[in-house]
């Protein structure tokens, strides 16, 4: 099982985390939010260290759903990137059975779910994992009867045991997702994506490529930088820009951004801002697309500084280049390795979605 140390999340400021580098102030409200998040994650990690051991910290992230239950003695981990589900417990098998059922039947609404507490996630009549996992008989897991029978089968036939470094014994099951689970999740959001694409004039395949790279279509996605949801919008940077564009004050709340419709609208709005404001002077549409992708990750200012410290000069230089040259520079010269890799990943994902449309 893949382990995620909380401290390893600190350096990564995922999508929209740098906005436009236009001198945005980190105000008192943001400072309080950040301090609150630090306290919460500190308490959370202390509980995990105490129960699971110092090398067993597993936390929710952009492409990983992680939920602790039973006072942190049971946990469920859905890797949306790797396509695998692991559910494990240090308690009795009834707890494991319950966790399997609740994980398979969890809903898609992340607004009311606190991933940093140990309560059960409600069972939904419209499970988010429906179509992404099948039981031992190849059935879709659509209701509590099927989920319960599958949980019983897993415990009787697929149960595994491991010992933690702190001496505790863990019993767990592993459930693979179907081969095309990413595409199944993507289809769930196509109506919202198409609506936003038409509204803001942004290519549908670009939105899909960014969303896959950001969250692998995980509606519960969160990063330590407090990037939220499917398109990993950071409230105090890109979120503020989007609200300002819409004539609103302040910034979107976490609950607001955990709504898929709001999140997709905010992410695509930010792409519109990049396209029509921060990178407006770039004339070649392909060069602009490369710059937009890179800027979604590292900020428009950081992208332009790759070419020149002066914005107008940077845009002039970009306009003198072929798109292939712009792409090569952004994927080899950009000072952020994350930004370099980001453009490679999104461009590849976008091409895949273009072919499948």
From Swiss-Prot:
Catalytic reaction(s) noted: Exolytic cleavage of the (1->4)-beta-glycosidic linkage between N-acetylmuramic acid (MurNAc) and N-acetylglucosamine (GlcNAc) residues in peptidoglycan, from either the reducing or the non-reducing ends of the peptidoglycan chains, with concomitant formation of a 1,6-anhydrobond in the MurNAc residue
Gene Ontology BP terms: cell wall macromolecule catabolic process; cell wall organization; peptidoglycan metabolic process
One term under GO cellular component: cell outer membrane
EC number: 4.2.2.n1
Key word Lyase present: yes
Subcellular location: Cell outer membrane
Family stated for the protein in its record: Belongs to the transglycosylase Slt family.
Protein name as annotated: Membrane-bound lytic murein transglycosylase C
The encoding gene: mltC
